[in-house]
């Protein structure tokens, strides 16, 4: 069996967005499952809109997602000689011809066809000419492909099944502009055949290009690759996903605290499923994903579901993995994890509740930095008359503990509740506010164990003093 070769071919006119990332993921999974090769090609022929910054953003996004490629990146702007050679091959074989029609003539033709409620298409005026016509001659002729006038093209699509196109519905495609630069439909065919691509997986907005490209493959003497056109992604309003729905850069999801494996998990489920299973690891996806099982219907992007999946992956991941991703978020907040509790230990206390790494970073700050103030609502609810005495009692007991561990700390909290004849919460909550500045933290015994005896005693004493000055 021929080795499977797929490609991801983004245009560097913007960031790597959700739709592009899903296409790349489907191609990558299909390749990895079958032990093939994944090729990265940058389609940068639009010189006005293509930027180095966009290329870097695409490469960075793929690296963050872990979508490694085996060959490339190849750049179309470095391949013009190859395109010119294949253009000449088609011209020499009579499969392509020069079209001298002016823009004005083509616009008049379009207007007349629309007035007759006909599909706008080239009328073949220059198709059988040996040279320029006698009038209305363009300064720079384009090159058109000589599309068969009769018959049909069948696209055997892995997702949509058999799709048939009548040749009579296809006009003679422009494959090179007046300045000699090749057009998209031509370059993509040349690239795919020269790079040995066997399976083209792309968005279904390219389906209508496929019969034209199949003609080009055949004219150049090559078998077309297999095709799979994945359905579009919709916003929750049923319209095509765009920036207004949150169709943002993949890297923005990174910056908002999503794990790459969570985003991959969500993207693969936008069109594919495996029974009722919701949460998948990347290795598991490589084993299970089948491009033939992708649904042909459009999928709806649901930010809440993505966040839920992110929480699931945070809960299930190894603490050292989370710590590697969490470190940069703490650094952004001016925190050096080396100057406090072990980051993996902090992660363990947060994994059950954090929805994003941003949330986890914000909730972890107090482990490395004393609170500058107490949240007003938390202080009002938990710092009451008599709280100072409870805090001072705990402070004294903490100082004298023979060992500093969660069990011993829990014993102090229990003993204090009994000594002051209050419920456990009347001790634990003031302690929580005292050390974290808020009423929300991991279990108090685990929290204090991580903070350490010296820091705990200092913060509890500081809070007791604050209560005496502000509450009484």
From Swiss-Prot:
Its cofactor is Zn(2+). Zn(2+) binds at residues 99, 101, 126, 128. GO terms for biological process: glutamyl-tRNA aminoacylation. Keywords: Aminoacyl-tRNA synthetase, ATP-binding, Cytoplasm, Ligase, Metal-binding, Nucleotide-binding, Protein biosynthesis, Zinc. It is found in: Cytoplasm. One of its GO terms (cellular component) is cytosol. Binds 1 zinc ion per subunit. Residues 112-130 have a biased composition (Basic and acidic residues). Its main location: cytoplasm. Pfam families: Anticodon_2 (PF19269), tRNA-synt_1c (PF00749). A motif ('HIGH' region) lies at residues 10-20. GO terms for molecular function: ATP binding; glutamate-tRNA ligase activity; tRNA binding; zinc ion binding. Monomer. Belongs to the class-I aminoacyl-tRNA synthetase family. Glutamate--tRNA ligase type 1 subfamily. This is Glutamate--tRNA ligase 2.
């Amino acid at each position: 069996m021929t080795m499977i070769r797929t490609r991801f071919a983004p245009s560097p006119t913007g960031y790597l967005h959700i739709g592009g990332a899903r296409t790349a993921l489907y191609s990558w999974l299909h390749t990895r499952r079958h032990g093939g090769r994944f090729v990265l090609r940058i389609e940068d022929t639009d010189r006005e809109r293509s930027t180095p910054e966009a290329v870097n953003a695409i490469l960075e996004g793929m690296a963050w997602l872990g979508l490694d490629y085996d060959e490339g990146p190849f750049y179309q702007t470095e391949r013009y000689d190859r395109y010119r050679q294949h253009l000449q091959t088609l011209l020499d074989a009579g499969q392509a011809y020069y079209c001298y029609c002016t823009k004005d003539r083509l616009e008049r033709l379009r207007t007349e066809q629309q007035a007759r409620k006909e599909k706008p298409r080239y009328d073949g005026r220059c198709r059988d000419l040996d040279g320029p016509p006698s009038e209305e001659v363009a300064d720079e002729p384009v090159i058109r492909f000589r599309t068969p006038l009769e018959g049909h093209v069948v696209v055997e699509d892995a997702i949509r099944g058999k799709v048939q196109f009548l040749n009579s519905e296809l006009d003679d495609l422009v494959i090179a502009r007046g300045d000699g630069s090749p057009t998209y439909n031509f370059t993509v065919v040349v690239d795919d055949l020269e790079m040995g691509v066997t399976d083209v997986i792309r968005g279904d907005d390219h389906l209508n290009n496929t019969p034209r490209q199949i003609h080009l493959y055949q004219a150049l003497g090559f078998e077309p690759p297999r095709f799979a056109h994945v359905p579009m992604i919709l916003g929750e309003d049923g319209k095509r996903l765009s920036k207004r729905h949150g169709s943002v850069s993949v890297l923005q999801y990174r910056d908002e605290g999503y794990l790459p494996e969570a985003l991959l998990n969500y993207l693969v489920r936008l069109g594919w499923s495996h029974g009722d299973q919701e949460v998948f690891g990347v290795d598991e996806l490589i084993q299970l994903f089948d491009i033939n099982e992708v649904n042909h219907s459009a999928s709806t992007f649901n930010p809440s579901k993505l966040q839920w999946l992110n929480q699931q992956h945070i809960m299930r991941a190894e603490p050292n993995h989370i710590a590697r991703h969490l470190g940069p978020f703490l650094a952004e907040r001016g925190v050096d994890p080396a100057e406090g509790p072990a980051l993996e230990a902090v992660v363990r206390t947060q994994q059950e509740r954090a929805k994003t790494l941003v949330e986890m970073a914000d909730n972890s700050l107090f482990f490395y930095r004393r609170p500058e103030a107490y949240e007003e609502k938390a202080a009002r609810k938990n710092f009451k008359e008599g709280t100072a005495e409870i805090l001072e009692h705990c402070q004294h007991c903490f100082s004298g503990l023979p060992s500093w561990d969660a069990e011993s700390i829990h014993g102090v909290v229990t003993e204090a509740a009994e000594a002051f004849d209050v419920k456990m919460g009347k001790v634990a909550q003031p302690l929580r506010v005292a050390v974290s500045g808020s009423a929300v933290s991991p279990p108090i015994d685990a929290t204090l164990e991580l903070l350490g005896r010296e820091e705990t005693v200092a913060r509890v004493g500081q809070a007791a003093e604050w209560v005496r000055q502000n509450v009484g």
